[in-house]
């Protein structure tokens, strides 16, 4: 039985009950301005007390009020969503803007009326998208849908089922009164008004990639053929993928990477995309005046023509120079180029260039680079040999190299012409070979020096000097310093002969008189060694004297003279001394002749009276003369010292060397490799 709570009487009709629709018309008892008596107030107060429970607030199911409340809640929720979307606009992804202006720009989408009053469409700057939508897992694929006047019905949903509400969209809801549960179906009733000129929608292609294929087909015509490159977030990855698709191998398998664009190289591997057909054919001729070798392949693709080149320029160029030059020749931007140097020691890479050069799809100009020939020709492959340490030692000995860093650099430079140097670079023990080679070279040099007398050593050092000089600047400089030449020559003769107590020359004088300049030039010619008193606290500071024919102690002070007077009297005598060498046993040897420069006269100080008989002193009084350009007025170089010794060879009582022109060289040149010297018959 239907019991309608809140109604009195059961004989009323359905229209008179609270569950139906009815119209209530108010009855006006008083008008505005009518006087109100106290009786009326009392009646109102009494009526309020009497009719407290007159209105029934209880709601019965099925009376239709839940539909109105549901509608009100939905409208309130829609208004709240619009307000939140307006406040947090920066968290929503920006509308997509086509970089080639094939669709309407963002300003035109947001304000179609503003676009309508313009005389012509303006090119707008590309807008940066703030946030990316979640991808399906197959890459950042973007598709631009058609733009035009249309009305979108229904709701746009993302892949996770949430409704995609754009800013400024109008939510249109309809009430479904026939629904028993009173709920609204948003999927069928909601929609979005796009506008008069339509809008650009950015969509994500799914795993099948059908929409992406359609877009690439539509943009592959005319000027939009390289739109895919422009839109790609990683343009280089797009070009590398297209290269592997066309040529069947990776671009990185043919090249080595240069991080800097300023690194120079003569050989370059260049791949250019989107070249016009006529230009691609013309580059085969235009590139020839610029290079010594060119290997060019031209293949068609949907972007245009793809040009792959292996080029050896006549002069070394960096990546920026190569890109600018080819951009001018091919009329293609640098963003459509891959430019890297080739792999010079990769057999598969060299074989690829060799095999493709013989095919009909390649055009080759010039002589094949040696790094391709060396790795592909059978004759060159047979010539590859194992590394020989003795050959490296012989090369270091012939070029007078005993420093490890210098030997490593110089020997690597000849790897293109020397098979042993190439084998050295291919070895995994380069550091060990380098250290061993320098050690052996120093041993050979030390043994050769110890075998020679002073006369032979001076002649040997003179043969290493290229060119002839003049001995007169040396004599003129001594006269400028008021040094008598004949007494100096006599003292210098006994100095070279190592006569006891005559094997130390001291050059005394004030500063800037040329003492160190004179001694250093002589020491450089004779290949001597320098010792420094600053290292006197070490037991090994005299070790360089064991490996030299002559020594130099520059700028001796009072403390240094005290040390010499205390510990080095026998060294100045030219007698046998004992030298401590680091990590090696003590060595007993005769001290070589020693040059000393000082600002203190040791002959006038009573503290060093026992050194007076062991020193031969020469005084430099005058400042060293220089020209207006700052150059020394008296040039003391190796050529002048060579001429000085050859000119005064007999006066210095040096032994005459054997006549090599008439009698030939009595001894063969030193060889540290097995085999015999090749002699002519």
Curated annotation (Swiss-Prot):
Glycyl lysine isopeptide (Lys-Gly) (interchain with G-Cter in SUMO) crosslink, residue number(s): 590
Modified residues (Phosphoserine): 94, 98, 111
Keywords from the named record: ATP-binding, DNA replication, DNA-binding, Early protein, Helicase, Host nucleus, Hydrolase, Isomerase, Isopeptide bond, Nucleotide-binding, Phosphoprotein, Ubl conjugation
The EC number(s) this enzyme carries: 5.6.2.4
Region ranges (DNA-binding region): 218-384
Pfam families reported for this sequence: PPV_E1_C, PPV_E1_DBD, PPV_E1_N
Gene3D superfamilies (UniProt xref): 3.40.1310.10, P-loop containing nucleotide triphosphate hydrolases, Zinc finger, large T-antigen D1 domain
Class in the EC hierarchy, top level: isomerase
UniProt GO MF annotations: ATP binding; ATP hydrolysis activity; DNA binding; DNA helicase activity
Catalytic activity: Couples ATP hydrolysis with the unwinding of duplex DNA by translocating in the 3'-5' direction; ATP + H2O = ADP + phosphate + H(+)
Subcellular location: Host nucleus
Binding site for ATP: 509-516
Motif (Nuclear localization signal): 88-90
One of the GO BP terms on file: DNA replication
Domain annotation SF3 helicase: ranges: 483-633
Region (Disordered): 124-221, 657-681
Function (record text): ATP-dependent DNA 3'-5' helicase required for initiation of viral DNA replication. It forms a complex with the viral E2 protein. The E1-E2 complex binds to the replication origin which contains binding sites for both proteins. During the initial step, a dimer of E1 interacts with a dimer of protein E2 leading to a complex that binds the viral origin of replication with high specificity. Then, a second dimer of E1 displaces the E2 dimer in an ATP-dependent manner to form the E1 tetramer.
Oligomeric and partner information: Can form hexamers. Interacts with E2 protein; this interaction increases E1 DNA binding specificity. Interacts with host DNA polymerase subunit POLA2. Interacts with host single stranded DNA-binding protein RPA1. Interacts with host TOP1; this interaction stimulates the enzymatic activity of TOP1.
Protein name: Replication protein E1
Organism: Human papillomavirus type 10
